[in-house]
Design a protein with these regions (language model features):
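Charged, solvent-exposed interaction patches on well-folded alpha/beta domains
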Residues: 1-44, 49, 53-72, 76-87, ...
Length: 252
């Protein structure tokens, strides 16, 4: 190895050690800095207002029992603060970190409901985009399809706890992800035999959907009913449309 190569290795090694030392020093200095402010951002609200900045700060500080502003950054445990915020059932995820300006940054992702559930006309719950069963929120009412069941509700935490619950969740997700069906389907009823009835927002027909399976095929038939049959026969001609039978659309 030449003298020039040895010299370059020494220079690079010294530069690396210097950089590591500077980063470590900056970290120590930053840990001793006091929190100046708390910045809360509710991500991707999309018209959902289940929580707000004030409530997030209350949860994070245990209703001001544990002060954050004025506390040294090194004394803050972001993980503990995240866990406190996530005790709100409508908070899907919380990220807490310290920035270089002395602020505590809090990013909150809310749960997104896809249906509001009524059980025997009494119990009232939301179902979110992950299938979780959530309580009703006094702050906000989500504009989502209503779903009723005629049997005892068996899913305590998540629809995906059972095979049938997973099928129901897939049906709700299918409706949620399609802009037309999301606007058209207002009411979903699960009957005692496990079959589904859909009630549209605009037209008067009850849709006998059958079991929550073969979603693509059944919704394709329903679209044919709306696009080809109703315009020819009249929008108020039929009271019911049955999608349960393969290759048939039965109108009554």
């Amino acid at each position: 190895m030449s003298k020039e190569e040895k010299k370059n290795i020494l220079i690079y090694s010294f530069s690396g050690l210097l950089l590591i030392s500077l980063i470590a020093f900056a970290g120590i200095k930053n840990n001793g800095r006091e929190i100046e402010d708390v910045k809360v951002e509710i991500l991707d609200q999309e018209g959902i207002f289940f929580t707000d900045q004030l409530e997030v700060v209350d949860l994070m500080t245990d209703k001001s029992a544990d002060y954050v502003v004025g506390v040294e950054m090194g004394d803050i445990d972001p993980k503990t603060l995240e866990e406190r915020v996530e005790t709100n059932p409508f908070v899907k995820d919380a990220q807490v970190y310290r920035d270089l300006k002395g602020n505590l940054q809090v990013k909150v992702e809310q749960s997104k409901p896809i249906a509001r559930l009524f059980i025997d006309g009494k119990k009232d719950r939301y179902i979110d985009e992950d299938g979780r069963v959530l309580p009703i929120n006094a702050k906000h009412t989500a504009r989502v399809p209503l779903m009723e069941t005629e049997f005892e509700f068996i899913w305590e935490r998540n629809l995906n706890e059972s095979k049938f619950g997973k099928q129901v969740f897939e049906l709700l997700t299918f409706i949620e992800k399609d802009e037309f069906w999301k606007a058209q389907i207002a009411h979903v009823i699960i009957k005692k035999d496990g079959e589904i009835e859909l009630y549209p927002q605009v037209t008067k027909q009850v849709v006998e959907f059958g079991k929550p399976e073969d979603l693509e095929r059944k919704f394709s038939k329903l679209m044919t009913f709306y696009k080809e049959i109703l315009p020819k026969k009249g929008w108020n001609t039929y009271d019911r449309v049955n999608l349960k039978f393969e290759n048939q659309i039965i109108c009554e």
